[in-house]
Amino acid sequence: QGHRGTPTVLLLLQAAPQVFFLIQGEVLGQGADDAAGTHRIDQDAVAAQVVLRMGNLEALKGQSTVGSLLPALLDKGMTSIPATSPFAVNVPGAIEAWGAILKARGTWSLDRVLAPAINYAENGFPIAPRVGFDWAKQLAKLGNSEGATRHYLFNGQAPAEGSVIKLPALAATLKAIAKDGPRAFYEGPIAEDMVATLNAKGSVLSLEDFAKHRGEAQTPISTNYRGLDLVELPPNGQGLTALVLVNILENFDMKSLDPVGPDRFHLQLEAARLAFAIRDTHIAEPAFMRVGVDKLLDKAFAKSLAAKIDRTKRVPLPPHPAPGGDTVYLTVVDKDRRACSLINSLYSSFGSGICTEKTGVMFNNRGSGFVLKPDHPNALGPAKRPMHTIIPALAMKSGRCDVSFGVMGAHYQPMGHTQMVLNMVDYGMDVQAAADMPRAFYEGNITLVERGIPAATVEGLRARGHEVAVEPSPWGGAQAIRIDWDRGVLIGGSEPRKDGCALGY
């Protein structure tokens, strides 16, 4: 519980997102989803892992209206849900998640937790460099919504780096939540404003959908990679993808390869294509999955997948979406070595781009993660959640948390987790070096590499059949804390691709 007035890990993780959704406004907010993984030491010194999967419980919930939505969209000739469509908006889960975690483990009142965010929203905060860079790219999206234009553009422009902005509508919304609790977001005037905004755009979400929303506590899933237990969120999250990916790569002697050489990146890319094919075929709401998690995590299955990889050339596989996405990740470890790994996201930058005029709530576009194929496990349907990309992670050794970490970047996240794990386990890197390493991913049939990858590696990938393009903008963003149990030291890492920092308190 911590000393009086001293914030514990979960209190810090409650106060921080409220501030971050303001200062990182283009990537998360009250209309976002939330996911957290926690590790605590019980009084008998036995380690226990708890993963709380909060948010996005009702994806377009409503048995009658949503049940008829899929054929209606198919009749319109739609093959996917557009990211800026009102049909892409799910009931936001973050507010309910914050309240549930605080109620379960917190010692501060909600109004105390929200006070810093309310202060910044009312009195202003400066725009960080990466935030300003990303915000400026969303002018067209923000200009398509009267609410977004009103609350997120300033004289018709994105705020410049270093400028100070205020968000009074969000401050008022937060004050209402601080006063009356999370249900003030899902019932009453705030919910009425949200539903009216969405219904005017054609959404079928109702006041009942918001009122019934509840988060869910789930049990984590894990696999062991050369002595390290990688712990991820279960489906409907894509954490399973990261576990399948490291299982595949365990069949190769990665340690013997140059960490920035073509062999290492070729194997990672080929294994990723296989793992993402598994994701896009199987991962969905657990009740709708036709192949269980245990079977997909079977080491023999991973070995059979590894056998499909040709070390000398690229093997054609189905294309995959761009890394993209906009997310905020943070992790905290307190004095008692309780760790929490938390991620919050609207999915795309500024989500759906749909924003309420009165309350300033920007809506997510998680519904675009559904598949518009009636026979697919991840098909759009009543009371279902779509395949979800946000995945905070924990790495465990001997039942204790070794590293609490995450890598922002939508579809890139499983690859980011894998590269972090390999960098730490196979190449002995500390968390900062593991996060700083240059990255390679793919978009469709194009292999994308960051500028830090050596020219010889690029040529080596091309020689193996990869069509390589250098990506001018970095993707992903890792934050990590390692617990050195022997020396009693915490080691933090925060990479330069984002506006983060490693901070001791």
Language-model regions, residue ranges each:
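Noncatalytic scaffold domains of N-terminal-nucleophile
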Residues: M78-D180, F185-E187, E192-G237, L297, ...
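His/Glu-rich zincin catalytic helix
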Residues: G2, P17, Q24, G29-T79, ...
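Extended C-terminal subregions enriched in glycine
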Residues: D336, K384, H417, D426-S473
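Active-site rim segments in enzyme catalytic domains, especially the processed small/beta chain
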Residues: A59-A72, K76, V204-S206, R338-V403, ...
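Short, well-structured alpha-helical segments that form the helix of a local strand-helix-strand
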Residues: D111-E122, D193-V195, A211, P259-R273, ...
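Short, small/polar residue-rich loop motifs at catalytic or cofactor-binding pockets
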Residues: A217, G324-T327, H388-I390
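Internal maturation/activation junctions in enzymes
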Residues: N251-L346, K358-T359, R366, E471-P472
